[in-house]
Amino acid sequence: MLITLEGIDGSGKSTAHAALRERLTAEETTFTREPTDSWYGSAVERSIGDADADPLAELFLYTADHADHLSRVVRPALEAGEPVVSDRYSDSRYAYQGATLEGVIDEPMAYVKRVHEPFTRPPDATLYFDVPPTVGAERAGATNKFEAADYLESVRENYERLIEAEPERFHRIDATQSESAVVEAAVETVETLLSR
């Protein structure tokens, strides 16, 4: 089973991912994230810090990192029968790069999805950490181009479109709650999913 954690910056998904890693010890589970720690992921991280990075080039950096992640980590773990829990995955690309490419290409989120469809492995379930963009930006510190509240509003709208298209896959977590409440909701949801 592939479970992904999604939400705008500052929503608490990385904190929940760390807590899940600590608390889910009953069975072998692969915990991973995107961007990865590969050289592809390093290129993505450099791009995040570059306010002038070309948005289309940036999309393909993220896509290369995702392809490597699939072949190196996700598919081998799933083939070995291990559940995978990923902090960010393809939906982040659809939501974030869909917002970044707005005004650059027509129907950007649909374009990004079409780029991924031939090779990606869709998640079985996704925890969506829902928080208002102003709260997310404040929590994240708005230290890069992807953490500004107005940009995060566009990203959140894209996430809502994804949820509307696949409501059965998404499990919404109210990330305006305390950190401990968010973590508990995430742990409970993942434990339920893994027990199916």
Curated annotation (Swiss-Prot):
HAMAP family named in the record: Thymidylate_kinase
GO molecular function: ATP binding; dTMP kinase activity
UniProt-recorded name of the protein: Probable thymidylate kinase
Pfam family membership, one: Thymidylate_kin
Enzyme Commission numbers on file: 2.7.4.9
Keywords for the protein's UniProt record, in alphabetical order: ATP-binding, Kinase, Nucleotide biosynthesis, Nucleotide-binding, Transferase
Enzyme category, top tier: transferase
UniProt GO BP: dTDP biosynthetic process; dTTP biosynthetic process; dUDP biosynthetic process
Gene behind this protein: tmk
Keyword Disulfide bond appears in the UniProt entry: no
Signal peptide: none
Recorded superkingdom: Archaea
Annotated residues for binding of ATP: G7, I8, D9, G10, S11, G12, K13, S14
Family in the record: Belongs to the thymidylate kinase family.
Reaction(s) catalysed (UniProt annotation): dTMP + ATP = dTDP + ADP
GO cellular component: cytoplasm
